């Protein structure tokens, strides 16, 4: 029996109707577009379509082995019924290829899905640190729900990182794609709640981390913090059961490290955490790590001490509550005991850290040097605050200007050491700082970001963290949209690529504290300047938003003190009755309600949008 295509061709010839001519999408396009059978824009010497998708344009040299010239329709009609035409469809991807970058993924992916997962690997995993990022990528390759969440985060991160270089219609399409993947991940994640094994719990915890990052990138900070609370409550239940997790997607110490960073976000912003018991004291972890052998261990150990410090600040607020004398004595004893414990832990860590820097650490990698500067910055900050008297008073900051300048010097070094963010053009800040000196600060408002991931990672990280220098051929289900364009993805350099988003210990909380607590104009405005120039988002800490808030607070205090704009002043020029405290809360969406309080009286209120 003749093939169906043969019957159609023969029937056409018998009736005298000319057969339809099979043509490619591009006759005069470049070789690459002709092979892919997509429309070429015929830009020379290299077409923009190939460049926008990260492909190499092979130029316009004719393909070898030209197809025979087709007969005119009149000659084809006279050819007779004995002529047989075989019409064969050639798919865009001739043969599915194995995903070299993601060998654990055994399902077919669309181009959008592959590009999202590729971007997650090349750019996004560095935001979690080398070890945690590797384990999250490994979990995404093994679990479909986590993989879908990783795709959504990769797509959203790509939209944010390339925002200024992407046309508006492509940005809208990227946002829509990220939200579609986000909703799909939520639907798949709901199925994990039905499971009772440790793998299901790990999947939920991993998705809480990824969803937090995705909502933070969108600017939905209240929703992001809710994901943190959900994950911390799951961890608290695990701790109460006292069961050791087995067959997990992520090692327990990796989960602990990730949620220590997320808990710090809740404590810094809201002063609350689900891991606080009824007395407001922390539910302590399983113990401190061993003596420091890697920079990442130093970061994890310090993070534990830093979170205890934040819990201490939160609980110390009870000292201002009206209670009877006996209860107040008990609260004071608890606070001072907790403060002494934090001080002891910090002193012990400092000795270990100094020994690590002197005898183990090698100063070779710029990203590692940034991480060391970050730890030195926060050690100085915590040591200074713990020696102010407890709880710290507004008047105490004026006597620690030397330590504050050391902290600002370290923050400046971190920003200057960061590679320039070439992926995005510099954008000026919303407000200007005219009239205020920026002692020790480089001029201009360079847009920079920083990466604090350690170069020294443990050997038990999953092998999927290794990045090849070339992009593997994706195993595609179909090409979703011939008109869609993709910004080229470059191989990750030896140290992590600059990223506008990170979960690592950052500079913004320290700079914000100095900008709002210190009333020396040179120190205050240098801190505000560094916030604006950092161009960075550390979880829910957004440099642009907090730059606006810090500048607004400073101007409120200066106006109340009768100071002209741009005037230099010391602590004494801002009396207590002119000082302002911010009481803010993130609302749903991209806004926050900010109240300005002076001497326990609300003097103003404002809604901030971003």
Swiss-Prot record:
<keyword id="KW-0862">Zinc</keyword>
<feature type="region of interest" description="Disordered">
    <location>
        <begin position="427"/>
        <end position="493"/>
    </location>
</feature>
<comment type="function">
    <text>Transcription factor that positively regulates the cluster that mediate the production of aspercryptins, linear lipopeptides built from six amino acids including 2 highly unusual and nonproteogenic amino acids, 2-amino-octanoic acid (2aoa) and 2-amino-dodecanol (2adol).</text>
</comment>
<dbReference type="InterPro" id="IPR001138">
    <property type="entry name" value="Zn2Cys6_DnaBD"/>
</dbReference>
<dbReference type="Pfam" id="PF00172">
    <property type="entry name" value="Zn_clus"/>
</dbReference>
<feature type="region of interest" description="Disordered">
    <location>
        <begin position="1"/>
        <end position="27"/>
    </location>
</feature>
<protein>
    <recommendedName>
        <fullName>Aspercryptin biosynthesis cluster-specific transcription regulator atnN</fullName>
    </recommendedName>
</protein>
<keyword id="KW-0479">Metal-binding</keyword>
<dbReference type="InterPro" id="IPR036864">
    <property type="entry name" value="Zn2-C6_fun-type_DNA-bd_sf"/>
</dbReference>
<dbReference type="InterPro" id="IPR052360">
    <property type="entry name" value="Transcr_Regulatory_Proteins"/>
</dbReference>
<feature type="region of interest" description="Disordered">
    <location>
        <begin position="61"/>
        <end position="81"/>
    </location>
</feature>
<feature type="compositionally biased region" description="Polar residues">
    <location>
        <begin position="1"/>
        <end position="26"/>
    </location>
</feature>
<keyword id="KW-0238">DNA-binding</keyword>
<dbReference type="GO" id="GO:0006357">
    <property type="term" value="P:regulation of transcription by RNA polymerase II"/>
</dbReference>
<keyword id="KW-0805">Transcription regulation</keyword>
<keyword id="KW-0539">Nucleus</keyword>
<dbReference type="GO" id="GO:0000981">
    <property type="term" value="F:DNA-binding transcription factor activity, RNA polymerase II-specific"/>
</dbReference>
<dbReference type="GO" id="GO:0005634">
    <property type="term" value="C:nucleus"/>
</dbReference>
<keyword id="KW-0804">Transcription</keyword>
<dbReference type="GO" id="GO:0008270">
    <property type="term" value="F:zinc ion binding"/>
</dbReference>
<dbReference type="GO" id="GO:0003677">
    <property type="term" value="F:DNA binding"/>
</dbReference>
<feature type="compositionally biased region" description="Low complexity">
    <location>
        <begin position="66"/>
        <end position="79"/>
    </location>
</feature>
<feature type="compositionally biased region" description="Low complexity">
    <location>
        <begin position="437"/>
        <end position="474"/>
    </location>
</feature>
<feature type="DNA-binding region" description="Zn(2)-C6 fungal-type">
    <location>
        <begin position="30"/>
        <end position="57"/>
    </location>
</feature>
């Amino acid at each position: 029996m003749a093939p169906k295509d043969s019957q159609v061709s023969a029937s056409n010839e018998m009736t005298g109707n000319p057969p339809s001519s099979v043509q490619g999408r591009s006759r005069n396009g470049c070789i690459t577009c002709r092979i892919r059978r997509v429309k070429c824009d015929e830009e020379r010497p290299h077409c923009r379509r190939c460049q926008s998708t990260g492909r190499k344009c092979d130029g316009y040299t004719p393909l070898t082995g030209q197809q025979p010239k087709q007969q005119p329709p009149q000659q084809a009609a006279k050819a007779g019924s004995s002529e047989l035409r075989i019409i064969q469809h050639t798919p865009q991807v001739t043969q599915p290829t194995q995903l070299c970058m993601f060998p654990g993924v055994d399902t077919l992916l669309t181009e959008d899905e592959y590009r999202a997962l590729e971007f997650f690997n090349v750019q996004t995993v560095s935001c979690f640190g080398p070890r945690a990022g590797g384990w999250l990528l490994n979990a995404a390759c093994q679990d479909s729900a986590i993989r879908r969440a990783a795709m959504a985060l990769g797509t959203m991160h790509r939209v944010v990182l390339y925002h200024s270089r992407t046309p508006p219609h492509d940005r809208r399409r990227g946002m829509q794609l990220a939200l579609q993947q986000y909703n799909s991940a939520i639907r798949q994640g709901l199925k994990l709640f039905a499971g009772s094994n440790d793998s299901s719990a790990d999947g939920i915890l991993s998705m809480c981390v990824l969803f937090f990052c995705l909502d933070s990138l969108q600017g939905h900070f209240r929703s992001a913090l809710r994901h943190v609370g959900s994950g911390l409550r799951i961890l608290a239940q695990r701790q109460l059961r006292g069961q050791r997790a087995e067959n997990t997607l992520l090692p327990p110490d990796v989960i602990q490290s990730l949620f220590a960073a997320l808990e710090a976000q809740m404590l810094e912003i809201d002063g609350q955490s689900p891991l606080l018991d009824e007395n407001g004291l922390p539910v302590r972890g399983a113990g401190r790590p061993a003596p420091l052998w890697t920079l990442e261990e130093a970061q994890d150990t310090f993070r534990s001490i830093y979170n205890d410090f934040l819990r201490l600040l939160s609980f110390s607020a009870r000292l201002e509550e009206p209670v009877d004398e006996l209860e107040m004595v008990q609260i004071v004893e608890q606070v001072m005991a907790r403060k002494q414990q934090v001080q002891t832990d910090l002193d012990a860590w400092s000795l270990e850290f100094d020994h690590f820097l002197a005898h183990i650490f090698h100063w070779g990698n710029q990203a590692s040097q940034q991480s060391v500067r970050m730890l030195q910055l926060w050690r100085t900050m915590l040591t200074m605050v713990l020696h102010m008297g407890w709880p710290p008073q507004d008047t105490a900051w004026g006597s620690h200007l030397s330590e504050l300048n050391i902290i600002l010097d370290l923050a400046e070094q971190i920003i200057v050491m960061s590679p320039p963010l070439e992926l995005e053009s510099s954008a000026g800040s919303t407000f200007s700082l005219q009239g205020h000196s920026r002692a020790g600060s480089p001029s201009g408002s360079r847009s920079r970001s920083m990466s604090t991931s350690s170069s020294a990672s443990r050997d038990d990280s999953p092998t999927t963290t290794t990045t090849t220098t070339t992009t593997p051929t994706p195993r595609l289900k179909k090409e979703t949209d011939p008109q869609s364009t993709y910004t080229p993805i470059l191989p990750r350099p030896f140290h992590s690529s600059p990223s506008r988003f990170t979960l690592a210990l950052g500079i913004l909380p320290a700079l914000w504290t100095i900008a709002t607590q210190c009333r020396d104009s040179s120190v205050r405005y240098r801190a505000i300047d560094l916030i604006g120039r950092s161009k960075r988002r550390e979880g829910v800490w957004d440099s642009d938003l907090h730059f606006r808030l810090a500048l607004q607070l400073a101007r409120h205090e200066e106006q109340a003190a009768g100071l002209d704009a741009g005037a230099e002043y010391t602590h004494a020029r801002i009396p207590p009755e002119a000082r302002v405290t911010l009481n803010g809360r993130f609302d749903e969406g991209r806004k926050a309600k900010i109240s300005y309080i002076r001497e326990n009286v609300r003097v103003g209120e404002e809604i901030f949008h971003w």
